[in-house]
Amino acid sequence: MKFASLLLGAALVTSVAGAAQLDITLNQPQLDVQPYHRPYIAVWVEDAQRNPVATIALWKQMEEGDKWLKDLRQFWRKIGRSAGKEIDGVTGATRRPGDHQLQWDGKDNLGKPLPAGEYLLNIEASREEGGRDYHRVAITLGKQGDISLPAKVELGPIQIKVK
């Protein structure tokens, strides 16, 4: 009986901590400006004390290196200026306008599942010779829900599903 309750308890802990997932639909609008430069976009998660715990995505112009990365001001202060090669795994080229899907498995940058609780999802966009948009929204890992963020200039509407 003790063994069965231990197994059940372990299964519950694993399901809360290990199965957390975010599905993000991020819209990048088509802007009628010349010259048009695709925006740099960063998406990351912070714990309740605002310490970065996971970088979900970083889209930048690969041939430009980090030249314009500092324009992602919040990301640069929190992660970018001190980041090394560890963000290479989530770094990719800038994207064309349209809807883009992102998923996060609920793990930190070291691959460890984060415990259920309160976190902050950050989404920032900045465009060379353009504008800058930033969203910060509270999410609760371990509690399912849907979040909608309104459109801004550089970022269209964003849909977040916490699983």
Q: Regions from the language model: what does each represent?
A:
Residues P29-L31, K107-G111:
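Short beta-turn/strand-loop junction motif enriched in small, turn-promoting residues
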Residues H100, L114-E124:
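A short tyrosine-centered beta-strand micro-motif
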